[in-house]
């Protein structure tokens, strides 16, 4: 099992799919990485040599922000908004949708499970 960016990627999957197990790398970035390294997209992880895995690891470390660094940056961005006290920060603080979605009927994922209110039934 190859270990890239602190993640054990599955060995019997195609390289493009396996790279997507790393937080911060989707389909587009996975294709860019293997194109930059020069490995065919159809290759499977267990077919890679150690030098090819090392090239992929170096490319990701050099050019992309993934896993812990990416999670930390997102958390710091949200914290910055909350500290500023701007509208988006207030919405984050109250666990409500941030981007203008309606909250009268929907937004259950963000607001949590519905709570019963006495006298609300008609």
From Swiss-Prot:
<keyword id="KW-0689">Ribosomal protein</keyword>
<dbReference type="GO" id="GO:0019843">
    <property type="term" value="F:rRNA binding"/>
</dbReference>
<comment type="function">
    <text>Located at the top of the head of the 30S subunit, it contacts several helices of the 16S rRNA. In the 70S ribosome it contacts the 23S rRNA (bridge B1a) and protein L5 of the 50S subunit (bridge B1b), connecting the 2 subunits; these bridges are implicated in subunit movement. Contacts the tRNAs in the A and P-sites.</text>
</comment>
<protein>
    <recommendedName>
        <fullName>Small ribosomal subunit protein uS13</fullName>
    </recommendedName>
</protein>
<dbReference type="GO" id="GO:0015935">
    <property type="term" value="C:small ribosomal subunit"/>
</dbReference>
<dbReference type="InterPro" id="IPR018269">
    <property type="entry name" value="Ribosomal_uS13_CS"/>
</dbReference>
<dbReference type="Pfam" id="PF00416">
    <property type="entry name" value="Ribosomal_S13"/>
</dbReference>
<dbReference type="InterPro" id="IPR010979">
    <property type="entry name" value="Ribosomal_uS13-like_H2TH"/>
</dbReference>
<dbReference type="GO" id="GO:0006412">
    <property type="term" value="P:translation"/>
</dbReference>
<dbReference type="GO" id="GO:0000049">
    <property type="term" value="F:tRNA binding"/>
</dbReference>
<dbReference type="InterPro" id="IPR019980">
    <property type="entry name" value="Ribosomal_uS13_bac-type"/>
</dbReference>
<keyword id="KW-0699">rRNA-binding</keyword>
<dbReference type="InterPro" id="IPR027437">
    <property type="entry name" value="Rbsml_uS13_C"/>
</dbReference>
<feature type="region of interest" description="Disordered">
    <location>
        <begin position="97"/>
        <end position="122"/>
    </location>
</feature>
<keyword id="KW-0820">tRNA-binding</keyword>
<dbReference type="InterPro" id="IPR001892">
    <property type="entry name" value="Ribosomal_uS13"/>
</dbReference>
<comment type="similarity">
    <text>Belongs to the universal ribosomal protein uS13 family.</text>
</comment>
<keyword id="KW-0694">RNA-binding</keyword>
<dbReference type="GO" id="GO:0005829">
    <property type="term" value="C:cytosol"/>
</dbReference>
<dbReference type="GO" id="GO:0003735">
    <property type="term" value="F:structural constituent of ribosome"/>
</dbReference>
<comment type="subunit">
    <text>Part of the 30S ribosomal subunit. Forms a loose heterodimer with protein S19. Forms two bridges to the 50S subunit in the 70S ribosome.</text>
</comment>
<keyword id="KW-0687">Ribonucleoprotein</keyword>
